[in-house]
Amino acid sequence: MGLTGRVRAYLNQWWRDIAKGADLVDLARIAVSEGATALKWYPFRFLPQHEQNWAVRPIEVQRAVDEVAAVRAAVGPNIDLMVDLWRRLDRAAAAQFCMQVAPYNLRFVEEPVMAENLEVLSGLARQSPVRLATGERLAGRQEFLAVIERQAVGIVQPSVIRVGGITEMRKIAVLAEIYGIGVAPHNPVGPIATAASVQVCAAIPNAVMLETYANGVPAVRDEFMSVNLLLDGDGFNVGTRPGLGVEVDEKALKRLATISGSARP
């Protein structure tokens, strides 16, 4: 596409050091001081992985709400905040959460319930004063169309590596635009997918923000790039280089392919 311009990004993984005992509120302040203007995190991360949606207690919902309030108080009103609930709630608990966080002006609440149940998701969307978002598990425009036509969310989150590439993601964006729905691509993966997602966001009118893990991934993810697209403050500069604007160092890639271990954040 080769467009010029800038794509705004929201930061994920800024909170990762809480596993080492760091304070979430302090980490939010640090991320903002380093240039982030939009932050996303997982306020129900404390729940056991096996806990079922219907087992979540009101006190656990309140704990998550209190965390949102604390982060908002720390970063002020001008920073966009988003939360990913990772499908941990049923409709009643999700409605309770969305109502209670309304005063804190979240940009969106991601996957509050199982997205496969469109009846529940669209019903929650009608109740919620906060935009809902989903899409990272959907593959192709047909699956997105079902969500979009039901007005089940205010923001869709296609992943360029899951939906089938740039062309398919742009078609999904067109469908969303018809219904007044924004696009905030899911992007926890590597530099090539990031570059592709940036190009799509630069080419569509309903791009909201692009997810980035730029501050929380192993360096090995970028070591095979001879020309890379790096986060600059709160976004990516599209630039004028041909293609995706990045180049792979094939020798480095072959070397890294022999190293064992995980490149996951």
Features from the language model and the residues they span:
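Structural signal for hydrophobic packing residues in well-ordered secondary-structure cores
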Residues: 72-75, 105, 201-205, 257-260
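N-terminal amphipathic alpha-helix/helix-capping segment at the start of soluble metabolic enzymes
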Residues: 1-7, 229, 236
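Shared catalytic-loop signature of beta/alpha-barrel
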Residues: 99, 105, 114-235, 239
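Catalytic cores of large soluble enzymes that bind and process phosphate-bearing ligands
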Residues: 19, 59-63, 164, 189, ...
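C-terminal extensions of enzymes
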Residues: 219, 224-265
